[in-house]
Each structure stands twice: as C-alpha cells, then as structure tokens.
Regions:
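One-carbon transfer enzymes
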Residues: 1-140
Length: 142
C-alpha cells in the first residue's frame, strides 16, 4: 500500500517507524514546520521529520494544507491511504478525498473525552483508569 504519513511528535514517529518496517511504501511525510525551542531558541527537527530523513523519505512542512500547490504535490504521489497521527493541522476535504482507501486518523486517547492536544497528559493528570488509542476513518460531513 502507498501511504502518505502526517504527524509531528515522538508518538507519531513511533507509528512511522512501524510502517517503515512493513511491506508498505511511505511516499512522503507531512510534518509541522521546524520551530525554535528551548532556552537557546535552537531550531529542532520534529521526531517525524528526523525519522523520515533517516529513511530517505521526502518531507513536506507546509504552514497549512490549504496553501496553493500542496494538494497538487500530494495528488501526484497517487496515495492509497493517508495516515494522520498527532499532526496538528486540519486536513481539508480535497486532501481527505485523495487516497483510494481514505484517510485514517490515530488519536492518543479514547475519544471523545480527550479530543484535542495532549490527550495522554490530560488523561493521566485527571487520574483516568481507562486509557487507550482511537483509530478512525476521517470522513467529510455535508
């Protein structure tokens, strides 16, 4: 299966590593743009970007998936599936409809309780006894 992978933090990089060990082909990776962090305001690569570069996979880092040209670049790869794991940007309708088998989102909580950012941290801080990961097919609602 030909996959476009979208993710940014370490949680997402772990998923990318598993896919890279499979028979599937990662066509390209989408990740958040490099940002300054820490006291020295040093530019750090996201864990997903580092994993992609270590495996010679093309990386796109658009500020938004709605920027002109992003759709065409992704369309030209002819993906079977887009896998989104803690990416941090909304995926627009035209991109959701690109892959043959759709777009799957992996979220680090049992939805809907901790939707949004930092779901694992929120579950732990709230003392939740039941935690897990949600897998869902991303659909367009009209």
């Amino acid at each position: 299966m030909k996959i476009i992978f979208a993710g940014t933090p370490d949680f997402a990089a772990k998923h990318l590593e598993i896919i890279l060990q499979s028979k599937h082909e990662v066509l390209s990776v989408l990740t958040q743009p490099d940002r300054e962090s820490g006291r020295g305001k040093k530019i750090n690569l996201s864990p997903v970007k580092q994993t992609a570069l270590d495996n010679d996979i093309h990386v796109y880092q658009p500020e938004s998936l709605k920027i002109e040209g992003v759709f065409d670049k992704l369309k030209n790869t002819d993906p079977d599936l887009i896998l989104v794991v803690a990416y941090g940007l909304l995926v627009p309708k035209d991109i959701l409809e690109l892959p043959k088998f759709g777009c799957v989102n992996i979220h680090a909580s049992l939805l809907p309780r901790w939707r949004g950012a930092s779901p694992m941290e929120h579950a732990i801080m709230s003392g939740d006894n039941n935690i897990g990961i949600s897998y869902m097919l991303s659909l367009i609602h009209i």
